[in-house]
């Protein structure tokens, strides 16, 4: 078993009381759990623990519109995906002295620090004398040349720790000619051999654009991506999961499990829990598989079935009524953050409101409503008053409705309450309904990474280092065979262009890495669908408890990944 070695101080002693310079992290004031994680050994795939070589696969294509992707990436399109394989020839080029940069891009996800640690340790082991720069504050740090030189002492307090505060992240993009020029100047100034971009689909799209730009300018700087997002929507056959998803789902599942026990204890509340996931519903689906709630809404299914908001409300109300017949006046309902974006009629209403409010003032008499189509007017009148006001009053700087600020869980509580009141009047429901709302979001982004995420991220970083040393660019670090023991994991790089499609924006084709949505024919959804009726009417609640770092379930992997890999979870 190849294992990570702990970073040492110059005197050979562990940096247990070291403050990471300029960041404020003191390992000396960590909790016992945090300190135990600092020294947690990280096994590596066996291919990374012995001499290896990088082998090219066949030429790659694109996820969609290959002819357009080829035009947008003339230097990179078609390059092969690569694999690391053992090499006993003795020809492996070691101890190159490299200058490598790393940048965190986008929202936080547990495990990011271990990606950085993996890159650093690879350089320390295989490229002695190399320098690693951490760009501060995300892509803006690359453009402005703001960085810190990473050292063993600097990195040590962050090993196996949550957060992105080692160098911090940002949501800036390198996309205009001026911004590309700034990035070029930084790369030249630091004489960078490589740059690792740790981010989600947008960030890795930008990483590919940067790799194309550097190659077209004959810069030696190579660019490698690493797949990050708790939403779980950056994945493919070659990139089985994005890091952070495993940890975030386990954190949310613990909280949901606690709420379930509370619901059962009081016997009088329905808990409506909104979960992160602006686009795909992967987090909601995984948390359902881990906890067995009474109702779980999956945005992709709502869209596929063309369900209306009234349909969704009626479905929840039906479950509430049926449970009341069994004496259960409580329950737990999971809602994906992006639910509204999957309901076509809501999108139509928002589009009409944006158009009307761009030219008219909302009058108290409601004359403006006459400009809504009959279907949208009916939907608007169906919404709770608080949501109506939110749609009309809370606008972004462009005057558009701020959909992300709509508290879907509170909206559904009010709509279900109204529906149940109507059923009471008809004698179809005679119990009491009380709703409690929750949003579990930021709580999951910076937790201590699970054993899986800690190890997976370390391997991603180590793999990224190997790809850069091998002269590769425009790839995303890929670690596979994740259902097997760590030693049997595969390591390689997937062509970023192979993950891309195009969208038409402002009359031009723009490259995008396609988000991986919940597949209704996929194994995770099918397993959920086969169980949900039983979960709805009975109490099959599971409280998984906190993330375990030792013991029989410490290395357990999330259901979604195992089911997608063909392993029964």
From Swiss-Prot:
<dbReference type="GO" id="GO:0005737">
    <property type="term" value="C:cytoplasm"/>
</dbReference>
<feature type="binding site" description="in other chain">
    <location>
        <begin position="276"/>
        <end position="278"/>
    </location>
    <ligand>
        <name>substrate</name>
    </ligand>
</feature>
<dbReference type="InterPro" id="IPR011183">
    <property type="entry name" value="PfpB_PPi_PFK"/>
</dbReference>
<keyword id="KW-0479">Metal-binding</keyword>
<feature type="binding site">
    <location>
        <position position="201"/>
    </location>
    <ligand>
        <name>Mg(2+)</name>
    </ligand>
</feature>
<keyword id="KW-0324">Glycolysis</keyword>
<dbReference type="GO" id="GO:0005524">
    <property type="term" value="F:ATP binding"/>
</dbReference>
<keyword id="KW-0460">Magnesium</keyword>
<comment type="subunit">
    <text>Tetramer of two alpha (regulatory) and two beta (catalytic) chains.</text>
</comment>
<dbReference type="GO" id="GO:0046872">
    <property type="term" value="F:metal ion binding"/>
</dbReference>
<comment type="similarity">
    <text>Belongs to the phosphofructokinase type A (PFKA) family. PPi-dependent PFK group II subfamily. Clade 'Long' sub-subfamily.</text>
</comment>
<dbReference type="GO" id="GO:0015979">
    <property type="term" value="P:photosynthesis"/>
</dbReference>
<keyword id="KW-0021">Allosteric enzyme</keyword>
<comment type="pathway">
    <text>Carbohydrate degradation; glycolysis; D-glyceraldehyde 3-phosphate and glycerone phosphate from D-glucose: step 3/4.</text>
</comment>
<dbReference type="InterPro" id="IPR022953">
    <property type="entry name" value="ATP_PFK"/>
</dbReference>
<feature type="site" description="Important for catalytic activity; stabilizes the transition state when the phosphoryl donor is PPi">
    <location>
        <position position="228"/>
    </location>
</feature>
<feature type="binding site">
    <location>
        <begin position="268"/>
        <end position="269"/>
    </location>
    <ligand>
        <name>substrate</name>
    </ligand>
</feature>
<feature type="active site" description="Proton acceptor">
    <location>
        <position position="231"/>
    </location>
</feature>
<feature type="binding site">
    <location>
        <position position="107"/>
    </location>
    <ligand>
        <name>diphosphate</name>
    </ligand>
</feature>
<keyword id="KW-0808">Transferase</keyword>
<dbReference type="Pfam" id="PF00365">
    <property type="entry name" value="PFK"/>
</dbReference>
<protein>
    <recommendedName>
        <fullName>Pyrophosphate--fructose 6-phosphate 1-phosphotransferase subunit beta</fullName>
        <ecNumber>2.7.1.90</ecNumber>
    </recommendedName>
</protein>
<keyword id="KW-0418">Kinase</keyword>
<dbReference type="GO" id="GO:0006002">
    <property type="term" value="P:fructose 6-phosphate metabolic process"/>
</dbReference>
<keyword id="KW-0963">Cytoplasm</keyword>
<feature type="binding site" description="in other chain">
    <location>
        <begin position="442"/>
        <end position="445"/>
    </location>
    <ligand>
        <name>substrate</name>
    </ligand>
</feature>
<dbReference type="GO" id="GO:0003872">
    <property type="term" value="F:6-phosphofructokinase activity"/>
</dbReference>
<dbReference type="GO" id="GO:0047334">
    <property type="term" value="F:diphosphate-fructose-6-phosphate 1-phosphotransferase activity"/>
</dbReference>
<dbReference type="InterPro" id="IPR000023">
    <property type="entry name" value="Phosphofructokinase_dom"/>
</dbReference>
<feature type="binding site" description="in other chain">
    <location>
        <begin position="229"/>
        <end position="231"/>
    </location>
    <ligand>
        <name>substrate</name>
    </ligand>
</feature>
<feature type="site" description="Important for catalytic activity and substrate specificity; stabilizes the transition state when the phosphoryl donor is PPi; prevents ATP from binding by mimicking the alpha-phosphate group of ATP">
    <location>
        <position position="202"/>
    </location>
</feature>
<comment type="function">
    <text>Catalytic subunit of pyrophosphate--fructose 6-phosphate 1-phosphotransferase. Catalyzes the phosphorylation of D-fructose 6-phosphate, the first committing step of glycolysis. Uses inorganic phosphate (PPi) as phosphoryl donor instead of ATP like common ATP-dependent phosphofructokinases (ATP-PFKs), which renders the reaction reversible, and can thus function both in glycolysis and gluconeogenesis.</text>
</comment>
<dbReference type="InterPro" id="IPR035966">
    <property type="entry name" value="PKF_sf"/>
</dbReference>
<dbReference type="GO" id="GO:0009749">
    <property type="term" value="P:response to glucose"/>
</dbReference>
<feature type="binding site" description="in other chain">
    <location>
        <position position="337"/>
    </location>
    <ligand>
        <name>substrate</name>
    </ligand>
</feature>
């Amino acid at each position: 078993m190849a294992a990570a070695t702990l970073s040492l101080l110059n005197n050979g002693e562990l940096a247990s009381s070291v403050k990471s310079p300029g960041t404020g992290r003191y390992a000396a004031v960590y909790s016992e759990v945090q300190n135990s994680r600092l020294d947690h050994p990280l096994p590596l795939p066996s291919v990374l623990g012995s001499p290896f070589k990088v082998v090219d696969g066949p030429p790659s294509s694109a996820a969609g519109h290959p002819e357009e992707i080829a035009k947008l990436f003339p230097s990179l399109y078609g390059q092969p995906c690569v694999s690391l394989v053992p090499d006993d020839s003795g020809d492996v080029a070691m101890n190159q002295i490299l200058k490598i940069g790393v940048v965190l891009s986008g929202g936080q996800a547990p495990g990011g620090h271990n990606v950085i640690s993996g890159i650093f340790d690879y350089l320390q082991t295989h490229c002695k004398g190399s320098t690693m720069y951490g760009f501060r504050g995300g892509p803006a740090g690359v453009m402005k040349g703001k960085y810190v030189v990473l050292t063993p002492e600097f990195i040590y307090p962050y090993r196996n720790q949550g957060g992105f505060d080692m160098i911090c992240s940002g949501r800036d993009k390198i996309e205009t000619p001026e911004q590309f020029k700034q990035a070029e100047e930084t790369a030249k100034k630091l004489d960078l051999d490589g740059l690792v971009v740790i981010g989600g689909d947008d960030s890795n799209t930008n990483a590919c654009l940067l790799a194309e730009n550097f190659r077209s300018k004959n810069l030696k700087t190579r660019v490698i991506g690493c797949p990050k997002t708790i939403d779980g929507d950056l994945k493919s056959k070659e990139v089985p999961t994005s890091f952070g998803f495993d940890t975030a789902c386990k954190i949310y599942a613990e909280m949901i499990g606690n709420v379930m026990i509370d619901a059962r204890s009081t016997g009088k509340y329905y808990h409506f829990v909104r979960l992160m996931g602006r686009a795909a519903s992967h987090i909601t689906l995984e948390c359902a598989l881990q906890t067995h709630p009474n109702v779980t809404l999956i945005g992709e299914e709502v869209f596929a079935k063309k369900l209306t908001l009234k349909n969704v409300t009626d479905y929840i109300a039906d479950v509430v009524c049926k449970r009341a017949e069994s004496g259960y006046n409580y329950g737990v309902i999971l809602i994906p953050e992006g639910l509204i974006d999957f309901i076509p009629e809501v999108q139509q209403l928002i589009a009409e409101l944006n158009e009307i409010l761009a030219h008219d003032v909302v009058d108290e008499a409601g004359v403006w409503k006459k400009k809504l189509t009959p279907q949208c007017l009916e939907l608007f009148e169906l919404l709770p008053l608080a949501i109506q006001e939110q749609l009309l009053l809370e606008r972004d700087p462009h005057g558009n409705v701020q959909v992300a600020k709509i508290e879907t869980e509170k909206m559904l509580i009010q709509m279900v309450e109204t529906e149940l009141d109507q059923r009471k009047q008809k004698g179809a429901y005679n119990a009491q309904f009380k709703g409690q709302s929750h949003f579990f979001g930021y709580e999951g982004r910076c937790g201590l990474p699970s054993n899986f995420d800690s190890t997976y991220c370390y391997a991603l970083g180590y793999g990224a280092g190997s790809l850069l040393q091998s002269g590769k660019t425009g790839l995303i670090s890929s670690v596979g065979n994740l259902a097997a023991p760590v030693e049997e994991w595969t390591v390689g790089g997937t062509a970023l262009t192979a993950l891309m499609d195009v969208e038409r924006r402002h009359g031009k084709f723009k490259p995008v890495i396609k988000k991986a949505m919940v597949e209704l024919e996929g194994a995770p959804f099918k397993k959920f669908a086969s169980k949900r009726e039983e979960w709805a009417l009975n109490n099959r609640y599971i409280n998984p408890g906190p993330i375990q770092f030792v013991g029989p379930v410490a290395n357990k992997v999330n259901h979604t990944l195992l089911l997608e890999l063909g392993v029964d979870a």
